[in-house]
Each structure stands twice: as C-alpha cells, then as structure tokens.
C-alpha cells in the first residue's frame, strides 16, 4: 500500500482476529525521515497512541494484533499532494475477509456506533 505525502492516511479502526487471522504481518518498505517526514502507522496501547514508524525502517517486519486500534496518521500533511512524489510504502499480508465467508468479519471503524 502507498500513502502519498500530502494526502495519504487511514482512519483509526480495528481488524477481526480469529481462526482466519491471529496476527497482521506488515513489511515496512520506507523509512520515516527519508521517504516521509511526519505521520505514519499508529497503534493504541493502554489508552495511548504510539507512532510505530518512529521505531522501524525499510525492511523491518512488524507483527501486530489486528484487534488493537490502529490507523495511519496523514503522511506529510504540510506538503502538496503529488502521487509520484514521496510517501510511505508498506506490504500488508492481512486477511480481513474471506470471499464468500460469513465467518470472518470486516474491519470495524473506531467511530462506528
């Protein structure tokens, strides 16, 4: 997935965890401070939000519990949008919905009622 500077983000949400998925493997394919300056993957732990990209660099593998509230803070919000410019790249290996299966639910937005 590509989160372009000036526009890329992902709303805070949780992903389903169950027999179809117990962990979300994420491959960091860019480095904060080189490919983008601000924003990044955030997770909530014990009521506090942490920016994961402050601790990883390109090539690192992140193993995350999808049930943790998470999202992507807007990447370089001070920059103008440029699809072919800088930004944040990641490889995501999650299974959020098995096609044709009602056993695996979809992601749940944090602001859902």
Regions found by a protein language model. Give the residues of each.
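Catalytic core of Fe(II)/2-oxoglutarate
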Residues: 21, 32, 36-113
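Conserved double-stranded beta-helix
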Residues: 1-33, 92
